Amino acid sequence: IGQDPFQINRIRDILLAEFGTEKPADRGFTPWDQRTVVHVFSSIEVACLDIIGKIINRPVVDLLGGKRRDAVPFSAYLFYKYEGAGGELEFGTDPNATGWAAARQASALNPAEIVSQAKAMCSAFGFQSIKLKGGVFEPRQEVDAILALHEAFGPNMPLRIDPNALWTVETSIKYGKEMEGIIEY
């Protein structure tokens, strides 16, 4: 607050001075954890770019180098999860829910449940591609989920898997070969 939005690097320096001394013990050890400053700075940087764009009457896309495409496709992002909806339902469920509202409450712990989750998401939101967030179970089970998605949706539905950098190189090669022609990445 009170900083010049045109001085984004100065704002980053202020955040680094405040939060940049975190050690891994302060943020967790998993590879996808990021330092607090990354999360705080990214939101402030976007706000600054929005302010700058409004001041000079240009869209943020122009500040980032210009428009490259007219649309950005979104992917259904599947997670393994236990029963319970989260959000306003906390860990409870609504037995009267249907469609996506019911699916988001259901467990998704095996290939059949992952397919069910994907069908509900794609039906409710029109997704044209699917990504499974893996690194939760043994790789074989996660690959089986991808194969089940491929069987359920067919070859025209782009599929992706993200094992959260938890598969070894050898595991990635082994299962990557098995999924060749089925997944985008």
Question: Whereabouts are the PLM-identified features?
Answer:
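Glycine-rich, aromatic-flanked loop segments that form ligand/cofactor-binding clefts
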Residues: H39, V46-G92
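Flexible, glycine/charged-enriched surface loops at secondary-structure junctions
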Residues: F6-N9, V60-L63, K133
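Alpha-helix boundary/capping residues
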Residues: L15-F19, K67, M179
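Generic hydrophobic, aliphatic-rich segments that mediate packing or membrane embedding
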Residues: I11, V40, I44-C48, I56, ...
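Alpha-helix capping and helix-coil boundary motifs
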Residues: D4-Q7, P59, A106, E138
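Short capping loops/turns at secondary-structure boundaries
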Residues: D33, V37, F41-E45, G53-I56, ...
